[in-house]
């Protein structure tokens, strides 16, 4: 049986699942958290005298220190652990990006108004870091452990909203990719080799799959 695949789709999938792409996400999240913690230190050193008269949810020094910042730091720790695993070649840890995407819900439950009187440029830079980290995390989450429609990659990139304005510099000519029909993964089987796979039943589906030496990881569920 003859197999072919669009080189732009493969190239983008290689980029989205790469260590460098994950590292960009991790670095921006780290910059966000460091910036946020510095802003919080400025805030707690200039607390208003009537802070304790405010409703408890508005006492940001307690709410953010004991809940928000703690949760964000725990997320950073898990990202760092995944980063170390991915660096050794275990790309099943890409799925930790869901941690960042879940931060939005937690952040939405706490008021950010304590930042209102802090340096505007520093506050903006802080949230810019977060926005970039989220954009990378979203693309990675849409790459693993799931799949892309080839048309999304070939036709819609980079304009579609799903790519969050992450516009990679594409090469003038793409590498030559060849499909190895001898490497096959069936549903609920362990992935034996990390790489990019095409679906035999749906040729418009392309997927990055990751192998792992750890038990229970790298299982393909279709």
Give names to the regions the model predicted.
Residues 3-193, 198-200, 209, 215-216:
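Long, low-complexity, charged/polar intrinsically disordered regions
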């Amino acid at each position: 049986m003859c197999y072919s695949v669009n080189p732009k789709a493969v190239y983008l999938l290689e980029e989205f699942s790469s260590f460098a792409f994950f590292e960009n996400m991790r670095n921006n999240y780290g910059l966000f958290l460091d910036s946020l913690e510095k802003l919080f230190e400025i805030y707690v050193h200039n607390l208003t005298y009537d802070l304790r008269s405010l409703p408890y949810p508005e006492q940001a020094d307690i709410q953010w220190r004991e809940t928000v910042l703690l949760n964000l730091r725990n997320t950073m720790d898990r990202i760092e652990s995944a980063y170390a695993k991915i660096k050794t070649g275990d790309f099943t840890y890409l799925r930790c990006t869901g941690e960042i995407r879940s931060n939005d819900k937690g952040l939405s439950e706490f008021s950010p108004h304590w930042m209102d009187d802090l340096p505007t440029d520093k506050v903006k830079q802080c949230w810019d870091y977060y926005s970039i980290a989220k954009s990378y995390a979203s693309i990675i989450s849409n790459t693993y452990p799931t799949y892309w429609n080839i048309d999304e990659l070939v036709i819609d990139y980079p304009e579609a909203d799903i790519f969050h304005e992450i516009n990679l510099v594409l090469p003038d000519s793409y590498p030559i990719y060849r499909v190895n029909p001898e490497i096959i993964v069936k549903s609920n089987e362990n992935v034996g080799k990390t790489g990019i796979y095409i679906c035999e039943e749906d040729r418009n589906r392309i997927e990055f799959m990751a192998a792992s030496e750890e038990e229970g990881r790298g299982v393909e569920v279709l």
